[in-house]
């Protein structure tokens, strides 16, 4: 099975947020991303792997801190060891070459992208913060149960707590993808990409920026 959609992508680091004025004098919140440089460490083809994809490496790491299989993998690609590896499935993988550098200029202004990262950890959270429950009334007979979830199941039918019930627990540190964010501008010289809106994760966290899947499908490009 072949992937018919062409995907561009780059790995980067979240530097923080700021705000800029656009051409219509509107204040726009943007996320600053240090995009790349990435290198191509592997190219997968339908003939050898059964699908078409390209593997990107990002972030420097000392050679002594990688395993022997990883060291052999990087040596085969002819690149220095990288801390992060991400595979992007794309129809044009055969056009990439081992060791090719991918930078912020892979995207241009007004492109739409999907940004994937790891959300901020919030620790143990109740149902109101974690799932948006409304809670109980603040007064009129409610006795110290204002933020409780309420009933979690019947006593005899079904007589158990249903699997997957939303309850209090650890919140955050999950893989999250924000879709259809627009690229505000790209500074190719400094490797900086400004994306409108917020993206997952704290400052300094790893991000994967790729072509927007739903925008491509809407424009007639098969996913």
UniProtKB/Swiss-Prot annotation:
GO terms for molecular function: rRNA binding; structural constituent of ribosome. Keywords: Ribonucleoprotein, Ribosomal protein, RNA-binding, rRNA-binding. One of its GO terms (biological process) is translation. It holds the Pfam family Ribosomal_L3. GO terms for cellular component: cytosolic large ribosomal subunit. One of the primary rRNA binding proteins, it binds directly near the 3'-end of the 23S rRNA, where it nucleates assembly of the 50S subunit. Belongs to the universal ribosomal protein uL3 family. Part of the 50S ribosomal subunit. Forms a cluster with proteins L14 and L19. This is Large ribosomal subunit protein uL3.
């Amino acid at each position: 099975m072949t992937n018919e959609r062409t995907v561009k992508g780059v790995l980067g680091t979240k530097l923080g947020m700021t705000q800029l004025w656009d051409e219509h004098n509107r204040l726009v919140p943007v996320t600053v991303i240090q995009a790349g440089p990435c290198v191509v460490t592997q190219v997968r083809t339908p003939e050898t792997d059964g699908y078409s994809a390209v593997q990107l490496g990002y972030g420097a790491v000392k050679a002594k801190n990688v395993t022997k299989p990883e060291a052999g993998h990087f040596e085969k690609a002819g690149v220095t060891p990288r801390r992060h590896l991400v595979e992007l499935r794309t129809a044009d993988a055969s056009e990439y070459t081992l060791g090719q550098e991918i930078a912020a200029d892979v995207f241009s202004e007004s492109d739409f992208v999907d940004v994937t990262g790891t959300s901020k950890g919030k620790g143990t959270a109740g149902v109101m913060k974690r799932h948006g429950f409304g809670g109980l009334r603040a007064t009129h007979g409610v006795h110290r149960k204002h933020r409780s979830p309420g009933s979690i199941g019947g006593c005899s039918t079904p007589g158990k707590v249903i699997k997957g019930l939303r309850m209090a627990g650890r919140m955050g540190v999950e893989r999250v993808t924000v879709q259809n964010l627009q690229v505000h501008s790209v500074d190719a010289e400094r490797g900086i990409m400004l994306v409108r809106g917020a993206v997952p994760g704290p400052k300094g966290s790893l991000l994967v920026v790729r072509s927007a899947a739903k925008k491509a499908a809407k424009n007639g490009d098969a996913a």
